[in-house]
Amino acid sequence: MKLTYDPRYNVAYIYLKEKTTQVKTIQVSDQMNVDIAPDGTIYGIELLNANQQLGADSQGKLIVVNEALGESSEIQLAL
């Protein structure tokens, strides 16, 4: 899995798999699109207004927690 983020547009994309086939984009809401293959496999999720969608804190940081290891990492989302 890979997460990309473009702070200029506040857009993130969560890659669940690399695209190996043509996908169909389904608009789930005004702020979320999901890319799905013909067999129903989800390839990725596009998040518009990513700071809010990803639950960034008031300083624009996304905190990723590895529950198994009890470790966390911070990613700066805001400019």
PLM regions with names:
Residues 1-79:
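Small, basic N-terminal interaction modules of short regulatory proteins
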